[in-house]
């Protein structure tokens, strides 16, 4: 969810 795709970005 940040500027770069993080593992936690999965929503």
From Swiss-Prot:
Name of the protein described by the UniProt record: Unknown protein 7 from 2D-PAGE
Induction of the gene: By elevated hydrostatic pressure.
Additional detail: On the 2D-gel the determined MW of this unknown protein is: 65 kDa.
Species this chain originates from: Fructilactobacillus sanfranciscensis (Lactobacillus sanfranciscensis)
